[in-house]
UniProtKB/Swiss-Prot annotation:
Record bears the keyword Transit peptide: no
Modification N6-succinyllysine, positions: K139
All residue ranges annotated as the B30.2/SPRY domain in the record: 12-207
Stated name of the protein: SPRY domain-containing protein 4
Organism (species): Mus musculus (Mouse)
Length: 207
């Protein structure tokens, strides 16, 4: 099924207002929580809005009413802070999910699309015990990572790069070339279990 994609400048305007001042490059980099207003109805946030868990629609729906910022078709949620410059690093505990996508997305991407399925989001996906990078619904396999408990994400806005990081070795596993055109926010999708984010971290030495 073809995925609809429509850009909405009104949503972008509201989004930047809601997310407030964009993150700037600093020693500690981006610090964010998950924005419940964007969360699909199958997702619930926990641990001070730093974690997200998946549940069947109608069983544990988010308490937030339907709104223009909310993802309608896919189990997606965005971070509440935008990035417009600098190098930023955060980690995600992934051990309790078997199917997810993590990365970044334009704040005004279509709420009827899924991250990785359009050309305004850049993600690393995990499903069927395999990792892939994703852009515009095109997948590229990632080898040599296995099933870690936690992974890192390194965003270099000026270089237009998003990297998946092995947190045990502090080394880059795979780098996805991006095409940022405006503010981006951390992005997450999952169809099983839960994810937990860890932000406000320094970029590790050597990366």
């Amino acid at each position: 099924m073809a995925l609809p994609f429509a850009r909405c400048w009104k949503l972008y305007r509201w989004g930047t207002k809601r997310w407030g001042v964009p993150a700037v490059e600093s020693r500690r980099g981006i610090s964010f929580k998950l924005e419940e207003k964007t969360a699909h109805s199958s997702l619930a946030l926990f641990r001070g809005d730093t974690g997200v868990k998946y549940g069947l629609v109608g069983l544990e729906p988010t308490k937030v009413a339907l709104n223009l910022e909310r993802f309608r078709e896919w189990a997606v949620v965005l971070g509440d802070t935008t990035v417009t410059s600098g190098r930023h690093y955060w980690e995600v505990t992934v051990k309790r999910s078997q199917q997810f996508r993590i990365g970044v997305a334009d704040v005004d991407m279509s709420r009827d699309s899924c991250v990785g399925a359009d050309d305004r989001s850049w993600v690393f996906s995990y499903a069927q015990r395999k990792w892939h990078s994703m852009l515009a619904n095109e997948k590229a396999p990632i080898k040599g990572i296995g099933q870690p408990e936690k992974v890192g994400l390194l965003l270099d806005y000026e270089a237009k790069k998003l990297s998946l990081v092995d947190v045990s070795r502090i080394s880059v596993i795979h780098t996805l070339q991006t095409d940022f055109r405006g503010p981006v926010a951390p992005a997450f999708a999952l169809w099983d279990g839960e994810l937990l984010t860890h932000s406000g971290l320094e970029v590790p030495k050597g990366l």
